[in-house]
A protein has these predicted regions:
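Small/aliphatic-rich secondary-structure junction motif
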Residues: 30-85
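Short secondary-structure boundary segments
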Residues: 73, 138-139, 168
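Glycine-rich, Arg-bearing micro-motifs that act as flexible, cationic patches
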Residues: 136-158
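Short, surface-exposed alpha-helical segments at coil->helix boundaries
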Residues: 84-96
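Short, flexible loop segments at boundaries between secondary-structure elements
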Residues: 162-168
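General small-molecule cofactor/ligand-binding pocket signal
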Residues: 70-72, 110-114, 165
Length: 168
């Protein structure tokens, strides 16, 4: 079975006032121990840069031996019907390599899936978790590209109340 085919245990669902699914949580097997010790949030997507951020966080977690890794994946807003049908599928596909990396290292994790502005949702989740810090990959944009397209890592770095590690 490939990592993309492995469906982790659903740990929670969140709906907005209109009943639209807006967030999901999944646990590794075995799940993170409770309470979380030294939680770190790692932003994940399907990119190689995102995977490098996960690999860096995994190495740090293994070295610390007491670090809880929370993966967060943010999707753009979807309609109510699309969210119910596709949110989990999209997020599990986009995070498959990240989850497989942590599983191979023997590190438990929790995957948080949300819809909305990526930087905003990453920071909101980090604050909610009382994360020690955030690890995020850089897309490697130059100055002009960053101005034109925006940079999630740049926005997180400047708005986060906790330390942010940007992995190139």
């Amino acid at each position: 079975m490939t990592p993309a085919q492995v469906i982790p245990a659903l740990a929670g669902r969140e709906h907005d006032a209109d009943g639209r699914l807006v967030a999901l949580d999944y646990d590794s097997t075995p799940p993170l121990p409770a309470p979380d010790a030294n939680p770190w949030l790692v932003a994940v997507d399907s990119s190689d840069n995102g995977l490098r951020a996960v690999a860096y966080a995994a190495a740090q977690a293994a070295a610390m031996n007491a670090c809880a890794l929370h993966l967060v994946h943010v999707q753009p807003w979807l309609s109510k019907e699309a969210a119910e049908a596709d949110l989990a599928h999209r997020a599990l596909g986009a995070s498959a390599r990240a989850r497989a990396t942590l599983d191979a290292a023997g590190l438990p994790w929790r995957l948080h899936v949300a819809m909305g502005d990526p930087a905003t949702r990453i920071i909101e989740r980090a604050v909610q978790l009382r994360a020690t810090g955030i690890v995020i990959g850089s897309r490697g944009l130059n100055v002009v590209e960053s101005l034109l397209f925006g940079s999630v890592a740049y926005k997180v770095m400047h708005l986060s109340p906790m330390p942010v590690m940007v992995v190139p």
